[in-house]
Amino acid sequence: MKKIAVLSLLFLCFYTIPSFSQSQGFGLGIILGEPTGVSAKYWTASNTALDFGLGYSFVKDSRFHLHADYLFHVNNLFETNENIALYYGPGARLRIVKNDDSRLGFRFDVGLVWVPKNTPIDVFFEIAPLLDIIPETAFSFNGGIGVRFFFN
C-alpha cells in the first residue's frame, strides 16, 4: 500500500506541466500540522484545483496520511489589496497505521490562501473535518499551515 501511495505522488510530480502563476499549473511545498508533510496543488481552472497531501502524524500512533481534495476558490471575498482567497472542497483521506488500524474516509477542506504579488509562492491555512467510513465510522479533524512554490 505504501508503494502505491509513493508511486502515485511521484507520478503526480513528474506528469504535471509547470506554469507561470499560482492560478494555473503545479505547486509543491510543505504543510505543518496534523499531519506534517508534503503538499501539492494542481490548478484545473482559474478557480478550481486538485490538492494533494502526503504526511506523517506524530500524535498517538505514528501514522502515514494521504489525501486528495477538489477545491473551489472564492476570490475578492475580502476587501484588501492583497490576493487572499477562501477555498473549500470535498476529498478523501487514507490513514495507514502499523497495527492494521488503517482508515479510509471523506474530508471537507476549508482554508485561506494568500498569494504574495509577483512571487511564485502561496501561503495557506486550512482545516478539514474528517469522516472515516472504513473499517468503522469515526469523526476527527486535520489542519495545518503551509507554503508551496509554483514552478515556472
In which residue ranges do the predicted regions lie?
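Short loop/turn motifs that connect adjacent beta-strands in outer-membrane beta-barrel proteins
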Residues: F20-G25, N47, N75-I84, D100, ...
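Short glycine/proline- and aromatic-enriched beta-strand/turn motifs that initiate or cap beta-hairpins
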Residues: F20-F58, H65, F150
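Positively charged n-region of N-terminal signal peptides that target proteins for export
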Residues: M1-I4
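Sequence/structural signature of outer-membrane beta-barrel proteins
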Residues: P35-G37, G55-D61, N75-L77, R93-N99, ...
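Residues that define the transmembrane beta-barrel architecture of outer-membrane proteins
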Residues: Q24-F26, E34-T36, T48, S62-L66, ...
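N-terminal signal peptide c-region/cleavage motif recognized by signal peptidases
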Residues: F14-P18
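Predominantly the C-terminal beta-signal and adjacent terminal strand-loop region
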Residues: D61-R63, K117-N152
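Residues on the lipid-exposed face of transmembrane beta-strands in outer-membrane beta-barrel proteins
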Residues: I30, V38-Y42, L54, A68-F72, ...
